[in-house]
Amino acid sequence: MANELEQLVLKKAQSWLDGHYDEATKKQVKYLMDNDMKELVESFYKDLEFGTGGLRGIMGVGSNRMNVYTVGAATQGLSNYLKKNFAGERVRVAVAHDSRNNSRMFAERVADIFASNGFQVFLFDALRPTPELSFAIRELKCHSGVVVTASHNPKEYNGYKAYWTDGAQVTEPHDKNIIAEVAKITDVDMIETGKNPENITILDEKFDEIYLNKVHELSLSPESVKKHHDMKIVYSPMHGAGVRLVPASLKKFGFTNVIMVKEQAVIDGDFPTVESPNPEERKTMAMAIDLAAKEGADLVLATDPDSDRIGVALRNKKGEYVLLNGNQTLVLLLSYQLTRWAERGELDGNQYVVKTIVTSQMANAVAEHFKVKCYDCLTGFKYIAKIIRENEGKAKYIGGGEESFGYLAGDYVRDKDAVSACSLAAEAAAWAMDTMGLTLDEWLQALYVKYGFYREGLVSVVRKGKEGAELIQKMMVDFRANPPKAILGSEVVKINDFQTLETLDVKTGAKTAIEQDRSNVLQWFTADGTAVSVRPSGTEPKIKFYFGVKAPLASVADFDKTLAELDAKIEGIKKDLKLE
């Protein structure tokens, strides 16, 4: 079997040596053929899959790697679909990229192919936040767009995300149709290149101003910022695309004391100061938190390399910096927006917010308090964008997000936006201090007293290879056939199955329809308010378990004790479900 695979791989590699590929690529392929069969197999044993979100993979030569040829095939396939879909129109597209190695080269390749296909292309002059690409598609009335990024993946990776006319990532039926067109590009000679460079328009800082002005329209408390303009804010762009625009946005909001983490303000696709540029991880935030402690900063903000995810750390009463999880950041931003909209008399029953089904139920409680509709959708910002699209002209979107550190305020962008989220987090801190004399950490605890203390946890069970994929599938089949009757002693009263799109009332046996997109996700809800969601990852060999528990918080004085109890409860649930 191994020999058979090696023969196929060698044949495929030889086709690269014989085909119209550049000499440097051929040289690398030849080197692997002669010296590293293992790496050659990894690089050629399959084609890098254009999935529902686009491409993501390790950079290198070969059909299973991110390189100008695989990026080229994806772009030609997308171009062919755009021509079919918008026949008779001059197709307009926007192209952006992050700080990763080769991102500029890939973005220029994408722009060249689009231009060679006769499209009007808007290419940013340098790296930009992903949300600005989404904004550009809408602002410049484009039919599509591409951003070259692998978000917060390790440095070896790069990726390619495709967007549609509304500035959101492509969804059905377009995603499947684009995948089919990309699959038809079987030869490098099918890719159009080197024509019509005049079709490319470069976007520069003038366009940034249009975007930043739109972000600034989200401001809700300019008076509070005036009083606390010199609040110390430490910011890290994690060597990425937020480096210019996040500080520029904070300045536009009125903040005058933003301290950059200098070492992480260097644009570098190797991300030399972090293992992985993911603001979800405390060790990634360590440099920013250390600087904040040294400076006595009130707030720590960070963005991932394409500046769509936000990391937030707050100083507590003991002077320690507490790293918020994505649920806490979402609850704070949502509470701030809804409180200010209510105080300004702007809530009239025609507004709504959105969260994903695995994001904290506390967001639902906050929305309910303000009599604002809260939609729950599948994991992924494209589903939040879909709800915004469906409500256009009917109701007003305020904000929303997901537990994985993504938030979007306002509907002028259709993907998560850490530029606006950073500015709103800073403004919320100024407002809380100005109106209540509270830090954001203290206000979050006050919200727990008001709505209940919600606490979340996550476990990822990794099962690699073909066997692993089968095991994950079997786990889901078993969970459907034999769901737990109780979790940590509390009876399971409701089950949501997003595969069958049914909710089961366990006591009565009654089933009701779930109005949602279909997905392989299960949720169990217990009598004591615990929620457990089970979801196999769409992109990695893992199955994720999301836990949500809650308890009343009588007063802030009980915070530490209740926190310990809730964390212990989450650990107990993991053991009960045999995940530990």
Residue ranges of model-derived segments:
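Gly/Ser/Thr-enriched, mixed-charge loops and adjacent short helices
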Residues: 16-20, 37-44, 48, 158-284, ...
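N-terminal small/polar loop signature for handling phosphorylated ligands or for N-terminal nucleophile
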Residues: 94-157, 256-311
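Conserved phosphate/anionic-ligand binding catalytic regions in large, soluble enzymes, centered on
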Residues: 44-64, 150-153, 237-249, 305, ...
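An N-terminal, well-structured beta->alpha segment
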Residues: 3-110, 201-233, 241
